[in-house]
Every structure is written in C-alpha cells, then in structure tokens.
Amino acid sequence: MYEYSDVNFYRESSNGEIVFRYPLGYVFSTYLPNVFLYVFLSWVVLRNHKLSVFEFIFLSFLNYVLYDFTDTRTVFYLVNLLIFVLIFMRMFNIDYKTKLLGRVLKFLTIYSFLFFALLSILMQVFYDPNSSWMFALNKALSGRLAYGYYAYDTYGFSILGQHVEYVDLLDVNQYNKLFVVDSGYLKVLLDQGIILFVFILFGFFRLGKRIVLKNNIYLGLAIIFSLVNIMINPHLLLITFNPFIFLLAYDNKNENSIYI
C-alpha cells in the first residue's frame, strides 16, 4: 500500500479530458481491476452453468464501478464481452459439440496461447513508428508496442533467459526513463528464455486438448480470456493474478475430474 501522493496517475481521454485514475489504495490503478478479472474468471469456472442473472448483474455493476474509478479499459471490455458470451451460450446451449461455434471455440481453446503469443510478440518485434496504423495502435495501447520493440532490440531472445533492467513508474526520475514490457508472452520470452516458453506453450496446448475432451466450455472460456488479457499485461507467471498457470502441472490421473 502506498500514499496517494505516490500514485497520482492521470490519463488523457479520447476527447482530450484529463482523467484521474484512482489506485484505490494499491500501487497502480490497474491492480484491483486485474485481480477482479481473474476472480471473475475463476468464479465462472466454479459456477459454470449455475451462474444466475443476479450474479451477472452484480458482476457487471462491480465492473462498471472499477472502470469508473480506475479507467482500466481492457478489464472493463473483457468482462463485458465475457458476460455477453456467457449469456449467448446459455440462450443457445452452445458447447464444444455445437457444429460451427463449437468448432471455433475448440480451436481457440487448444491454440489460443500460440495464436495470441505470436500476435503479441510479432507486433512488438516488428513495430514500426513510421507506419500510421501501428503508431495509432501503439498510442491506444499506452506505448506498449514501442516498449516491447525497445526491449527486443536491446536484449534479444536467449535460450535460458536473462536479467532485464526494467524501470517502472515508481522508479522514474530525471536519470531513469520508463521501461516496461507489459506483454506477458514477450516478458517471459525475454526473462525466462526460449526453452521455458516452449514448455509453457506445450502445456497450454495439452491443457486445451483435455478441456475440449471434457467439454468444459466454461474453463475453456476462462483460459481464452485470460490469454487475451496476457497480451497486454504481464500476468502469465504471476500467481498473484493468474491461478490458471497451475493447471499446466495437472497430471490427469483423476479420471473422475469434472474440470480437466
């Protein structure tokens, strides 16, 4: 917990207004909304088809309150989208066995780590500020593409990982400029190296196959949405946020498991 004087963060909105992002007692204003996202995803897995209308309304209300105070857009949009998807699935009884949408969800569940990792990493490695659309996207993502490109250009990738000297917001001064990598995929590849990254990739592929085999569409959606969020947030290996990383260690010996 930090004093408010240490965390007075502002952001310019799309209409030019300056928005104060309340940290709500934490170091960063994005902390509590991201915790809420993973709690919500975990709640979806535990409650699955038992989720009620009251729960949807209550979670939507909490999501809006957090967005109003913190202006954390990614979490706000992801939670709203997931609630819409869950309601749509409930209305039309969709799971992995559904002909068209089921196949799409099956593909995303199995290959989402590979797809989102490639998209996130390549967008940063090949970032070109002279490209108008990439420059605009970088601005919308609060400079994440530029920071990722700088990290790759400075350190490159290694087999076993390396020490990367980051400079977060609390350490910025006249001598140290901000330097962060928010993409969970790129950060793991830079910090932990290619070998561990490949093991994690294989783990999520194996996990996705088991989820589809069990027809657990709710766990599959939770994994997909968490991996989308990891594209712009460094939560892949952070157990303070992401509980789903533990599923990679599941040995599949319990044949009666209803989850995987």
Region spans (language model):
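Extracytoplasmic catalytic/substrate-binding loops of multi-pass membrane glycan-assembly enzymes
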Residues: F135-G148, I159-V167, N176-Y185
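Hydrophobic transmembrane helix bundles of membrane-integrated enzymes that assemble
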Residues: M1-S132, Y150-G156, Q174-Y259
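Serine/threonine-rich, low-complexity intrinsically disordered regions
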Residues: L170-V172
